[in-house]
């Protein structure tokens, strides 16, 4: 069009050939493929906010929070999907992916079932935001097949999924520098694996009575407090349904 307005008439194919020969590129932005994917996946299937920020009222393995975060490394970006027990703060399942297709979110649910299926039932709630992955037919059908209850935050209200958001914040604070130095996707996977293993087993939290998430789960399951020998170290424990 610019040439036409200056009085020059030229075939489009010739223009493209000359641009290629001179390494010229059109500055017009191309559509983000993930935005198109999000539009294609999005449905009107928004679940009720059953949890409504009552993260601890149901007990362990009853309210499971899920979300996706971006991890930027030297060669690009990858995506982490996690499922967190709102009561014990354990990461029960996670998947890393180099793309945002819905498959890796469904794979996270499948890992949850493989690893913890015997502790879950038809009262287990999977709570998420209203992202296109969680409103997709594939995800909804996966939860329905597993006999889980689906719950969603209100649109744009991050506090409705606060423990999951907090987990991502702490994780990124700890590993951001290390991730930024990673050259390959496999290196990011190793860093994520190591940190989540550390978090579940060795990251002690005041809100969990100075225990790690896995220790806290065992304490709630057995009633045996591992720090009982240290006088005054025990706080008042919540009384979730076990």
Please provide the spans of the model-predicted regions.
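Conserved, non-catalytic sequence blocks in retroelement Pol enzymes and Pol-derived host proteins
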Residues: 5-8, 56-57, 73-74, 129-130, ...
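Mobile genetic element proteins and their domesticated derivatives, centered on retroelements
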Residues: 15, 19, 51, 67, ...
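RNase H-like polynucleotidyl transferase catalytic core
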Residues: 28-34, 125-130, 144-163, 179-184
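Active-site beta-loop-alpha junctions of metal-dependent nucleic acid enzymes
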Residues: 76, 95-119
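C-terminal domain-tail junction helix/linker
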Residues: 137, 144-148, 170-242
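An active-site-proximal beta-strand-loop segment
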Residues: 53-92, 98
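Acidic/histidine-rich, metal-coordinating catalytic segments
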Residues: 118-135, 209-213
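Basic, flexible linker segments flanking DNA-binding modules
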Residues: 1-59, 157, 212-222, 227
């Amino acid at each position: 069009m610019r040439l036409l307005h200056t009085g020059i008439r030229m075939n489009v194919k010739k223009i493209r050939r000359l641009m290629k020969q001179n390494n010229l590129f059109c500055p017009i932005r191309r559509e983000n493929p993930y935005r198109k994917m999000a539009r294609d996946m999005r449905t009107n299937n928004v679940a009720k906010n059953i949890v409504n920020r009552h993260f601890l009222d149901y007990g362990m393995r009853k309210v499971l929070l899920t979300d996706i975060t971006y991890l930027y490394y030297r060669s690009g970006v990858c995506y982490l999907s996690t499922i967190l027990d709102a009561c014990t703060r354990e990461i029960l399942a996670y998947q890393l992916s180099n793309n945002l297709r819905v498959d890796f979110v469904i794979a996270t649910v499948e890992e949850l079932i493989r690893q913890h299926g015997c502790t879950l039932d038809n009262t287990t709630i999977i709570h998420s935001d209203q992202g296109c992955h969680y409103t997709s037919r594939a995800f909804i059908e996966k939860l329905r097949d597993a006999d889980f209850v689906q719950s969603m935050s209100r649109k744009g209200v991050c506090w409705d999924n606060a423990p999951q958001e907090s987990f991502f914040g702490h994780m990124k604070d700890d590993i951001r520098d290390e991730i930024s130095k990673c050259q390959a996707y496999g290196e990011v996977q190793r860093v994520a694996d190591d940190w989540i293993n550390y978090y579940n087993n060795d990251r002690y939290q005041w809100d969990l009575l100075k225990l790690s998430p896995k220790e806290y789960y065992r304490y709630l399951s057995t009633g045996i407090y591992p720090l009982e020998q240290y006088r005054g170290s025990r706080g008042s424990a919540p009384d979730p349904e076990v």
